Every structure is written in structure tokens, then in C-alpha cells.
């Protein structure tokens, strides 16, 4: 499984329907935007047998308007999506999400006054 598979899946979810999503860095020209950036995970403890699952790490970096409450609510909606989704199917692989550190990180506002947050996610997937 690749981060692109996750991006394509996320684009189909109602919680992310109103936000452009791309791989790489944040697009500072858009008021609403999600950038998905791969992050390195430490050693992963085996789930099931050592060869049955693997994981990738993703940093979801979100910009969402100039109203803090609206931006925070959108991020909570996305966080809830990951916490409540069990056995998602991405290209025939079963996927489970774990939100790292429990809470998103508030990154502040950019020079245009747009609020930015980061949510770190571990994506466990069934190996084929």
C-alpha cells in the first residue's frame, strides 16, 4: 500500500469532500487544503503474525479558513473518521487507522490568517 492509495480513499470520504488533497507540502494559496506527507515510523510491533500486517505513517496537514472554531471542527470531523473506521478497504487491502498522540497539533495562522493543524496517523494494512 502506498500513501497515494490513502489519498484516493480519503477523497471519497464525506468528511474531506470540500477540501483539495495532494501529496507533499501545503499549498499556501488555498484557504482550504490538505497535504499528506509520509512520516517515518519506529519499529512496528507485529499484529497477528509478523508477516500479516505492515504500516505507513502519514502527517495530515490541514489549512481550513480564517475561523478557528470552523477549522477545529473540520479537523475533529476528520479525526473522528479515522478513529471510527475499521477494516476499510483500500485496493483490496484491509486497513485500520491509529491517530498518533491522541490530539491534533495546532500550527497557528499563516500570514493570510488561515488556520493550520497537523494530525499524525498510522495506517495499518493487511499484506497481500
Descriptions of predicted regions:
Residues 1-49, 85-91:
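Small/polar-rich, solvent-exposed N-terminal microdomains that initiate assembly or binding
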Amino acid at each position: 500500500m502506498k500513501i497515494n492509495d490513502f489519498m484516493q480513499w480519503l477523497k471519497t470520504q464525506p468528511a474531506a469532500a470540500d477540501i483539495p488533497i495532494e501529496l507533499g507540502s501545503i499549498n499556501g494559496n488555498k484557504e482550504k487544503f490538505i497535504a499528506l506527507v509520509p512520516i517515518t515510523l519506529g519499529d512496528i510491533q507485529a499484529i497477528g503474525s509478523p508477516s500479516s500486517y505492515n504500516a505507513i505513517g502519514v502527517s495530515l496537514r490541514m489549512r481550513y479558513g480564517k475561523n478557528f472554531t470552523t477549522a477545529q471542527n473540520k479537523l475533529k470531523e476528520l479525526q473522528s473518521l479515522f478513529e471510527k473506521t475499521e477494516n476499510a478497504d483500500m485496493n483490496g487491502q484491509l486497513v485500520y487507522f491509529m491517530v498518533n498522540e491522541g490530539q491534533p497539533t495546532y500550527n497557528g495562522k499563516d500570514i493570510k490568517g488561515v488556520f493550520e493543524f497537523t494530525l499524525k496517523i498510522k495506517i495499518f494494512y493487511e499484506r497481500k
